[in-house]
Amino acid sequence: MAFGALGGRGSRRSRRSVSARVAFGALGGVLAALVVPSAAAAHGIQLVTDLPIPEWLFAWATAIVLVVSFVALATLWPAPRLDPPHDRAWRHYPPWLDPLCGAIGIALFVLIVYAGIAGAQLVTANITPTWIYVVFWVGLAVASVLFGDAFRPFNPWRAIARATAWLVSRMRRGAPAPEPLPYPAWLGRWPAALGILCFAWLELVDNPAQRVEPRLLAFLALGYAAVQLVAMSLYGIETWTERGDAFAVYFGLFALMAPLRWADGGIHRRAPFVGAVALEVMPGTIALIAVMIGSTSFDGLSNGTVWISLFPHLFSLFTSLGVSSPDAATEYSYTLGLVGMVAIVGGMYRLGTLGMRSIGAGYEAGDLARRFAHTLLPISIAYVVAHYFSLLAFSGQSMIYLVSDPLGTGANIFGTANFQPNLAIVTGNVVWYVQVGALIVGHVGGLMLAHDRALTLYRRARDATRSQYWMLTVMVAFTSLGLWILSSTQ
């Protein structure tokens, strides 16, 4: 998106003065938030051991990029441009595509559940764990940001509910169906936030051997689907899908940032990130985003040197409180770490909005938190890419042989059962560059959205810029947190 044209020669001196004030204010925010480590190692399978430039230079370079971006936005983006978001119709898709995708989603769900129950219980031989933790959890998040809501058309429980509703309507021969219950406004997206937190607990806290057990994952998938179907029957299919279905809401939030929007039988194009402006903030939305960022952060933290030092103290705390089982004390410690990291993320954002309130204009901190919640979405996908890129690049290759032998029974359906993943497909340096690049792009995107929203809320551009000193501090703090976690990972 092009910046607005600059003014005439007479305004250059004032702009230089404004730029200087903005730069000094931004520098103050950076110095307040920047805490960077001296060691760097990529999260995932390979460690970074031979970076081409010093690690501290990476960290300061990212902070400088954020400051330069902030100054550029303050001087070259004087009026709001993104609210409301604009898109253009691009292509139409046939009406049969949606039910076809739904049928594919149901078939895949049946395959994953059947493989988990009836297949080999070895994690590397059964398709279920890799599909859930790599393709579904990570791959679909990235696909949603690139191509739009990739999960919605394939959502198996939504497809089952819609097919059931269609059959019931045919059986009733035109008789009106019972109206769904009104969805409680106070409930908002809290069910989705709780669902994502529970999945993160399964992935990061539960017993390592148990969390990847194919049969357990299959039964959990069946249980989750049953809950969704019951909730859809009570509150309506689309209402629950947009508010309560944890994974539908999770991927839907990522899809807001995609350059493509699928709606009304057509594909619409827009600039990346700008769709986040349309985020409908309801109860539980900010908590959900905090869970998204905090759980990803804890995944990296729990593999790092800081957690290795902290964990024994937490373990001793719970044993001193009467927890006799070592496994239980371990789970309690990790649970506290997970919840604590989510609270830290939420607290950092809350501090930023409390600081913005000092600018005046009559906005309360809670109102500002809701109005700027969409600015956290680019950070959430930045953390996903930074922490899971190596997982997707290396473990994702396992799908090549698993599709030929999904149950681990020795089959070779597509002739790829003997494929060996290439662990040298990307180097450690490439992993590091992708991770740092994702953090920079995500936080610059968040700054852009925050700056545009500030221009919408504050009458004077100067007040809008001053309010964003606090948001810049938050963004740099999130960047520093991400780099610190990556660098401390073992």
Q: Where would I find each of the regions flagged by the language model?
A:
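Hydrophobic alpha-helical membrane-insertion segments
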Residues: L140-V145, P283-G300, T375-M399, M475-T479
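Transmembrane-helix bundle segments that line or gate the permeation/cavity pathway
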Residues: G44-R270, G284, F298-N303
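Juxtamembrane boundary at the C-terminal end of a transmembrane helix
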Residues: G482-Q490
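Interfacial loop-to-transmembrane junctions
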Residues: L449-M475
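Long, internal scaffold/assembly segments composed of regular secondary structure
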Residues: S233, T241-L354
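N-terminal secretory/membrane targeting signals
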Residues: M1-A42
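Hydrophobic alpha-helical transmembrane segments and adjacent short intramembrane/lumenal linkers
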Residues: L376-V384, F394-G396, I400-V441, A450-H451
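Transmembrane alpha-helix/helix-exit interface in multi-pass inner-membrane proteins
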Residues: T296-V306, I344-G355, I379-I413
